[in-house]
C-alpha cells in the first residue's frame, strides 16, 4: 500500500498531471431553475456512477446513472429537473476496484454524513436572511470562544428544554438565570460583557458524535467529515438535511442581531479518518505522505491534509468563501495553522479581501504543529517562525504572552508572572507591544478550550483562593493591555473550572457545559471583566493596529515583578479618548510597592485590589502605592 500510495503521489506532483487536470471551475451539486448539475473531480477514475436515494442513510439506490467524463478529469451529470431533496453518493472505479464516496463538495447530507444531499439552498433561508449582515466593526476586536452545546446545556441557564445544546438556543432571547428575570444568560449576557465576536468551536459536520444517538453525546468537533455542511447533532432533526442548514442560519442571524460577529473554527489540517470523500474520490491526492509512502502525522490525528497540492488549496479556498457567502460568516480561526502553507493562508486572505474588502473578514490561527509534517513542493508552513511571510492581517495566537502570564500550559507546575515567576517581567513588557510584530499578527490571550482553564491552572500553582482571585484579575489586566486582538475563553470571566481536567474534548457534557450559576457566585469577577473590556475599547493606543503602534507605549518603571507603562491615546474616527494619556501598572510581587508617577495628575480608573471603602474617583500625583498582585489603570487629567 505504501509503495502504491507514494507512486500515486509522485504522479500527482508531475507537471504533466497538473497541466492536464488542475481545474478552476465549480464542483459539487447545484440546483437552479434550469435543473440540476453535479460535478466531481477524479482524473484517475475509470468510470463514475451517480447513485440517487430517497433516504439519507438507509435503503438501496433508486437510480444509478453513469456520469460523463469532461475536461480536466471532471465527471458531470446534468438534468433539466430539480432534484433538491434527493440524497446521493458516487461509485468510482479506480484501478479496477469500485470505491464508494460521498461528495467532497457536499452542501448538505443525511444523518452522520453517510450520504450527500442535493439541495436548493434558497429554500433554507430564514425570514429576513437576505437583509442579514455583520454589524459594523467597533474600536477593537474582542473575541469570545464558545462551544454550541456548552453554551445552552445548563438547565439553570433558562433555555427551553427542546433547544438546550442546539443551534436554536441562540434564537431564544432574554433568557435569565433560573428563569428568575434578574441575571441575563445567553446572548444578552455575552453582549453585555462587551465583546465584539463570538468564535464557535467546530460547527461543520464532524464524525465524533453520533447524530442519531442521544443528547448526551459530546465532542469539541476537531474531526472533520463534511467540510461544507453544518454539524447535525446541534440541529433539531439531523436526519433531514435541510434542517441543520436553516437552523444554523437562524443562529448566525440571531448573533448578528445582537450586534456580534461570528468566527468559525475550521480544521483544514486533517480529517477524522481516511474514510471520507477526499480520499475515496481521489486516493492520496489530498493527504501528505513521507518518502516511503506512509501518512504524515504532524496533526497527531493520523493524517495531514496536503494543502500545498493545487486542488486541495482550491478546495480550502472554495470552502472558506462558501461559508462566508452562504452563511454570512465573519472570520475564521484555523486549527493547527502551522500545518497549512503560507501560500494558502495568504491566498485565503487575498480571496476574502477581494470579495468583501480589505480586513473585513478576520483570519487567525494556531502557528504551530503537533509534530513534524512532510510538505511537498518546497512549501513553507504557517508557523510562528514564518509569521513575517504571512499577510499582515493574519493573526497568530501568542503562546508567548499566554505562558509568560500564567506559566507553561504543558508543565502544569511551572508558574508565570502573576503566580510567582517574576523573571517573566521582560516578556510581559515585550508582549504589550506585540513582541515587535504588527499588532494585526497577534491574538493576545491567557486561556482557551485547550489545556487547563485559567482558574484551574492557578489552582495548581496557588493554594489560597483569595490570592488566586488576584492572580486571575492581574492575568486579564495584562493580556487586555497587550496590543493585538483580544481573545477570551467563555467562562474565564466567572472563574470557569473543569475540575482540573486539561483535555476535555470528549468528556461528559456535564463537565464541559457553561455553569451559568457561577456568573452569580462570581459576579464581582464578571463585573471586573466588563469594566476592563470597556476601558480597553476607549484606549486607542492599545487598539492601534498600525506598524507604529508600539510608539504609543513607553515604560516608566520596571523592576523584577513590577512594570509601569504610559499609553498615548489619539483620537480616531471611532473613539474620542477621555484620557489622552493613561498609565498601566502591574505588580506581581506579594508586597506593596510605592511608585513615582510621571508628572501630572491622574484619576484612578481601575484597581484590581481595592481597599475597603475605596472611592472610584481618587486623584493621585507624584507617588502611588500599589498592592501586591495588583494592576492599576490611571488616566491623566
Regions found by a protein language model. Name each.
Residues 40, 90, 146, 190, ...:
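Conserved, mostly hydrophobic/aromatic
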Residues 59, 64-65, 69, 215, ...:
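Active-site-proximal helices and loops of the catalytic beta/alpha 8
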Residues 437-602:
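Loop/helix patches that line or flank the sugar-binding groove of alpha-linked glycan CAZymes
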